[in-house]
């Protein structure tokens, strides 16, 4: 193989790698936060997503949630409820269930760790025991938690 052909082949390979063969962010479901709850031995997971199709100004959100026997099952069922590919690269908040012990926190952290890459920082909160309607409360919980971080200059993230 001559040098020009090898160079051309390498150029084509590099172009294919860098051309964005995947979907653009505007075509993906962008996950901003994940909330976990545990009730009666079952887990529920709620994904708070940036609603890129909202027509009003400002940040708009939508949710997808599901219940499962384990946190992983609940998370996967919530993901499967969405039509597009998920993008966790902008995930910046996770909320753990009330009464979460260290072992549960490690399990949930491991579950999110691979998905959240390359998120620069992931803040972790523990929910209180109040009942939550994910569809109604997830966006306000997220905004309240982010406001607390900013107001009190909290830095409770995993980097």
Question: What is each PLM-predicted segment?
Answer:
Residues 2-14, 18-159:
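Membrane-proximal alpha-helical signals and transmembrane carboxylates
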């Amino acid at each position: 193989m001559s040098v020009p052909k090898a160079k051309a082949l390498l150029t084509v390979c590099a172009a294919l790698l860098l051309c964005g063969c995947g979907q653009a962010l505007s075509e993906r479901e962008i996950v901003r936060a994940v909330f976990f709850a545990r009730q009666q031995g079952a887990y529920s997971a709620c994904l708070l997503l940036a609603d890129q199709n909202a027509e009003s100004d400002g940040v708009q959100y939508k949710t997808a949630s599901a219940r499962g026997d384990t946190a992983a099952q609940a998370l996967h069922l919530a993901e499967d409820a969405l039509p597009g590919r998920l993008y966790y690269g902008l995930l910046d908040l996770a909320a753990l269930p009330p009464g979460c012990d260290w072992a549960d926190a490690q399990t949930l952290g491991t579950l999110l760790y691979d998905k959240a890459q390359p998120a620069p920082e992931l803040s972790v909160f523990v929910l209180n025991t109040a009942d939550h309607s994910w569809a109604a409360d997830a966006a306000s919980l997220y905004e309240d938690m982010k406001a607390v971080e900013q107001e009190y200059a909290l830095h409770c993230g995993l980097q």
